[in-house]
């Protein structure tokens, strides 16, 4: 389950004359066929796929434009079907009053669940059936081989959004210089196939919503 709630477009900011971000993000000539789904739904879908290792195969989407006069969607509910018979749903909104940048991901399995919030990025909650919840901290006692070299400051010191971009740049530089585990790094980085796949997700969501939320395969795009 993915939820990305923002509130900054709750009014028609694109007409204020001072909010350039709102102007281009709500303009179909510059941002494409989708509003909130393209802007933040794309990140939510990609993050779910990155965490699970699964791929979205089809969607049933309901895109809505609540702010009168706006050209693109500002709210969306999307059911997703992934490979391995996994199902999920996305709740996307840029008109959620009081929200700032509330991106949360929850992965539920038969034996456990994992929860993470972008606004509190240094912690994840792991729940296992029959046991107490466990809080996993960035840089804490639980580490794996992939985490070494990616944690730059000691545990308990905030690290997150900007460092995430820095890590991508660092991995790309290592690949170019043919350092470390090149193939392992390539598996972690987004590429042209990732971008194409997410564009298919966006367009499939738009098409689904236009067709009464009918299930739409990404491969049909």
Go through the PLM ranges and name each one.
Residues 1-70, 124, 212:
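Predominantly a Rossmann-like dinucleotide-binding segment in NAD(P)-dependent oxidoreductases
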Residues 38-113, 118-122:
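Glycine-rich, aromatic-lined ligand/substrate-binding cores of catalytic
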Residues 44-45, 168-173, 202:
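A general structural signal for well-ordered alpha-helical segments in protein cores
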Residues 57, 88, 182-187, 211-217:
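Core catalytic loop region at the nicotinamide-binding pocket of NAD(P)H-dependent oxidoreductases
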